[in-house]
């Protein structure tokens, strides 16, 4: 450049000639015509997101490392300003998320045009921009990205979403119908029934396990099934209106199944000869009522909001997994009583859910949605043809005669097979009424004892932890912001009230949120509350049909056990899937989960090895549930000994206690632990969409004087 030119490289203006004269420059030194150049210092912390002069002047937006332009973000629905309840295709205005650098550091378009002109940029503005750049974090690890996205409510983990091929974060799940969508009355009926049909294994198979264990008749089994259908409908409607208001079915949970079997097979109840079913059911009713009251207090008092600070995915994952693993000694040993039915059923379930999961018929993935009812129906039909064809006809053997009255050993074996395999072994159809309305205290007034009440208090705590994980996962799947701690507490309190109803009506187990809801919503892509309410109304009507309960009670026990093997395995996988919110490669996390699961199985096995003296009268698959009366915990206080031996023989309770203590005492960052970050109540008050999703019905809220509850 000519030394006489006064060209300013920043503004592009000529400042005049450099020679002396009347310009006033003659007295200045030659170097005064140019800005002083600072010594060059190499920048070691290079950030590719920092924009250079050309990008600043033109408004260029980088596509580096997952950054997208506005148009790209609109196309794929990955904007942080995305209005989730209205669908991912709608973008609202606002400041962009960290994955996008706005033109010229967040300034609007008129200011961009202003910069590209010939007017100089003031030094103060330049310094302000540089300070703003320095305030931006230069690098972010994956854990930080996940935690930030979770805090903003815009990160959708892999629970149902397909991973992108380029290694980016999974996309949000595109739902057919959102939380408040109303597709019309006829579609609501279809999708409502579809939701409950996909959960049929969890809704009706528990009575097929507990009622025969209590020596109940086939008629009693049909009555308990009808009661469960009624309570499922009522409690689901209550939850959709007064609980968390997420589209979650309430019903008899497997969390309560293991403790119920422990009480049933304890020495005090397994040796009853008269009225064994009614006496045992009344004992269970009293224990469930006490446990439900504890859960109500936990929710309504606000203690649950405090407890939520210590409940994280590292605690939830092994606890829910232990619920399914608790029945590994019951599952196939019971199903193996009729292998010609159980093995084909398990294989068919695996084929439908794994190999044919992508096959669509008439636009519906029937094999994923209806895998359980379709498989059970096909194998039940197959078992019917085996029965009609005489496969289980043994000369001189009658399944109606009690085993104790049969003298021939070979005939005893055949009778055992006939009871578990024949489709006509049940007399529920002949004995059940056409119309039967379940009513409160139908088995008599409940019995209250400290030993069983302590058991159910621990179980209700585990059920609450299970529900917390389900609430969080469901809110992420349905593309809604996560609820506040108060809403979660409200949901837990309502679950306690629902369990209270279950204890009063005598369903045999408590009522809680079914973990399988996550799988159902994920495969049906339907999250409409109205659909669940319509389906629940149908369940209430069907519960009055006594013959329907009789048909379900006629399902062979081997068939029911085979379906439960698959559902319990699904429960394990759904529980472990909560780890996707954490850093799964963390040695801390995998150690806590591994130790909790292993000791959660091993410690109860130590208590279960103290078999009862009368173990010969118990089938092998019931022996692990008979440790309450003969366990090693002996203090001389009979009630306390019974309760502690029973509690420490439950896999899920031991696993929860270990995971809870370890996760909250071993140091770890929030990103590493995947800490649940719930929405603040203040944010909910300012968000009309969130209030519409979670707030109580307006008239009900006005009665209690709460505006945003």
Curated annotation (Swiss-Prot):
Span list, region Disordered: 1-28, 58-167
Regions crossing the membrane: 196-216, 222-242, 246-266, 288-308, 310-330, 336-356, 369-389, 454-474, 532-552, 555-575, 590-610, 642-662
UniProt key word Membrane: yes
Membrane topology: Multi-pass membrane protein
Keyword Phosphoprotein: no
Record localization: Membrane
Keywords, sorted A to Z: Membrane, Transmembrane, Transmembrane helix, Transport
Amino acid composition bias (Polar residues), ranges on this chain: 65-74
Superkingdom of source: Eukaryota
Record-level Gene Ontology MF annotations: transmembrane transporter activity
GO cellular component term, pick one: membrane
Biased composition (Basic and acidic residues): 75-89, 108-132, 142-151
Chain intervals with Gly residues compositional bias: 15-25
Tissues expressing the protein: Expressed in leaf primordia and vasculature of pedicels, rosette leaves, sepals, carpels and siliques. Expressed in the root central cylinder.
Family of this protein: Belongs to the nucleobase:cation symporter-2 (NCS2) (TC 2.A.40) family.
Name of the protein: Nucleobase-ascorbate transporter 11
The gene coding this protein: NAT11
């Amino acid at each position: 450049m000519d030394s006489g030119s006064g060209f300013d490289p920043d503004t592009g203006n000529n400042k005049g000639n450099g020679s002396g004269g009347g310009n006033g420059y003659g007295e200045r030194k030659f170097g005064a015509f140019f800005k002083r150049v600072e010594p060059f210092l190499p920048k070691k912390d290079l950030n590719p997101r920092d924009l250079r002069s050309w990008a600043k002047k033109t408004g260029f937006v980088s596509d580096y490392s997952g950054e997208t332009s506005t148009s790209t973000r609109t196309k794929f629905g990955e904007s942080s300003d995305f209005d989730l309840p209205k669908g991912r295709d709608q973008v609202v205005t606002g400041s962009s998320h960290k994955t996008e650098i706005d033109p010229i550091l967040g300034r609007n378009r008129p200011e961009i045009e202003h910069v590209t002109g010939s007017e100089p940029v003031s030094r103060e503005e330049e310094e302000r921009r540089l300070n703003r750049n320095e305030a931006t974090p230069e690098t972010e690890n994956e854990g930080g990205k996940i935690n930030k996205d979770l805090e903003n409510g815009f990160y959708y983990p892999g629970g149902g979403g397909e991973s992108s091929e380029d290694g980016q974060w999974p996309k949000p799940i595109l739902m057919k119908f959102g939380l408040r969508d109303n597709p019309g009355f006829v579609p609501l009926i279809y999708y409502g029934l579809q939701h409950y049909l996909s959960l049929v294994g969890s809704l009706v198979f528990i009575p097929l396990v507990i009622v025969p264990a209590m020596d109940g008749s086939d008629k009693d089994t049909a009555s308990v099934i009808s009661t469960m259908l009624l309570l499922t409908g009522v409690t689901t409607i209550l939850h959709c209106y007064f609980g968390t208001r997420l589209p979650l079915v309430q019903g008899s949970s497997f969390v309560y199944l293991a403790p119920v079997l422990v009480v049933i097979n304890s020495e005090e109840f397994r040796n009853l000869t008269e009225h064994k079913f009614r006496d045992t059911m009344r004992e269970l009713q009293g224990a469930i009522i006490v446990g439900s009251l504890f859960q109500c207090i936990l929710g309504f008092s606000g203690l649950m909001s405090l407890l939520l600070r210590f409940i994280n995915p590292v605690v939830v994952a092994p606890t829910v997994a232990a619920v399914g693993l608790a029945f590994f000694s019951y599952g196939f040993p019971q199903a193996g009583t009729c292998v010609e039915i159980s093995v084909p059923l398990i294989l068919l379930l695996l084929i439908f859910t794994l190999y044919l999961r992508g096959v669509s018929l008439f636009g519906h993935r029937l094999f994923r949605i209806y895998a359980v009812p379709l498989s059970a129906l096909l194998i039940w039909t197959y078992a019917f043809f085996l029965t009609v064809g005489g496969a289980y006809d043994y000369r001189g053997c009658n399944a109606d005669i009690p085993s104790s009255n049969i003298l021939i050993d070979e005939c005893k074996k055949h009778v055992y097979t006939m009871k578990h395999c024949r489709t006509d072994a049940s007399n529920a159809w002949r004995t059940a009424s056409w119309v039967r309305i379940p009513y409160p205290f139908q088995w008599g007034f409940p019995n209250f004892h400290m030993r069983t009440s302590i058991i159910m208090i621990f179980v209700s705590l585990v059920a609450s932890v299970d529900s917390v994980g389900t609430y969080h996962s469901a809110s992420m799947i349905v593309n809604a912001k996560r609820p506040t701690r108060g809403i979660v507490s409200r949901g837990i309190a309502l679950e306690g009230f629902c369990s209270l109803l279950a204890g009063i009506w005598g369903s045999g187990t408590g009522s809680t949120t079914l973990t399988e809801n996550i799988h159902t919503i994920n495969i049906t892509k339907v999250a409409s509350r109205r659909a669940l309410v319509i389906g629940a109304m149908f369940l209430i009507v069907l519960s009055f049909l006594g013959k329907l309960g009789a048909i379900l009670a006629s399902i062979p026990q081997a068939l029911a056990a085979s379906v439960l093997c698959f559902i319990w395995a699904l429960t394990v996988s759904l529980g472990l899937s909560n780890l996707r919110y954490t850093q799964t490669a963390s040695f801390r996390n995998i150690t806590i989960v591994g130790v909790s699961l292993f000791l959660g199985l091993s410690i109860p096995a130590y208590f279960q090895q103290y078999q009862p003296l009368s173990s010969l009268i118990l089938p092998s698959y019931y022996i692990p549930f008979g440790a309450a009366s003969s366990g090693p915990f002996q203090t001389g206080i009979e009630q306390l000994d019974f309760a502690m031996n029973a509690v420490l023989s439950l896999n899920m309770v031991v696993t929860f206690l270990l995971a809870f203590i370890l996760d909250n005492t071993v140091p770890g960052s929030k990103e590493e632990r995947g800490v649940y970050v719930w929405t603040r109540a203040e944010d909910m008050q300012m968000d009309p969409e969130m209030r519409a999703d979670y707030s109580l019905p307006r008239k009900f809220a006005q009665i209690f004087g709460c505006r945003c509850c």
